[in-house]
A protein has these predicted regions:
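Walker A/P-loop phosphate-binding motif and the immediately C-terminal alpha-helix
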Residues: 2-38, 42-46
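Short acidic, S/G/P-rich loop/turn micro-motifs used as interaction or catalytic elements
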Residues: 10-13, 88-97, 124-127, 144-149
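Conserved beta-strand scaffold positions in the cores of enzyme catalytic domains, especially
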Residues: 2, 31-33, 81-83, 138, ...
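Conserved catalytic-core segment of NTP-binding enzymes
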Residues: 103-191
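Phosphate-binding loop that captures ATP/GTP phosphates
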Residues: 28-83
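Cytosolic-facing regulatory segments adjacent to core modules
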Residues: 66-77, 85-121
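NTP-binding/hydrolysis catalytic cores, primarily Walker-type P-loop NTPases
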Residues: 186-207
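Structural motif
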Residues: 6-10, 35-38, 86-88, 120-123, ...
Length: 207
């Protein structure tokens, strides 16, 4: 299954939710987290690695036959989930086409052993509608302040204009509890499943 975490109004809460969701689901299933943001901010928190998402896409362009080997060689661990280090170059990220994103998801689904893919999706891919249609469910963290509400309402209108009612049917808008991530270090992020956000997600998954 593919679950997308997306929000046009609250990028920080979106990523905290996605990381926590991945770790919790990873306790019982084989989970891969993919960050699809042009500026994830995770490199400093999760550490720098020799390979990242841009390299995986580049390899996909060159040699699809050994894709699974390359994917497995790039996977890193964070708590109970696996992840591919996100792009650290805005230019590299912007050169990835929707066709390549869709091919990547198809190959992971068809060739890997992952039960669940968590997509932490930004608002600058330029292909949100097409990618949202690849998933089995969409989680959207929302805030109550007027600006956030305005952004969500504008996004809803945009989706309806583009005949995206099928996307809205997959959507769950979530008002998250206040976070307790402390200083924002890797150890703080790894503790999210045991904090209020983790309890909220566990209840959400069983409801």
């Amino acid at each position: 299954k593919i679950h997308i975490v997306y929000s046009p109004a609250d990028a920080n809460a979106k990523t905290q939710f996605a990381l926590t969701l991945g770790q919790i689901v990873g306790e019982t299933q084989h989970v891969l987290y993919l960050n699809m943001e042009e500026c994830s901010g995770l490199t400093g928190l999760l550490g720098e690695h020799h390979w990242n998402m841009a390299d995986l896409i580049y390899f996909l362009r060159q040699n699809k036959s050994q894709f699974l080997y390359r994917l497995n060689s790039m996977v890193q661990k964070f708590g109970a989930m696996d992840y591919i280090p996100p792009c650290d170059s805005y230019t590299d990220f912007c050169q990835i086409t929707v066709k390549e994103w869709k091919k990547l998801l198809h190959l992971i689904r068809s060739q890997s052993t992952y039960d669940v893919i968590i997509l932490d999706m930004g608002t600058s891919t330029g292909h949100e509608l097409e990618l949202l249609r690849q998933c089995d469910g969409i989680y959207m963290p929302v805030k109550k302040d007027p600006i956030s509400r305005g952004k969500i309402e504008q996004w809803d209108r945009y989706i309806q204009i583009l005949d995206g009612l099928d996307i809205l049917e997959l959507l769950q808008k979530l008002e998250l509890p206040p976070d307790g991530t402390g200083s924002g270090s890797e150890s703080d992020l790894s503790m999210l499943p045991e904090q209020r956000l983790g309890s909220y997600i566990r209840e959400l998954l069983t409801s």
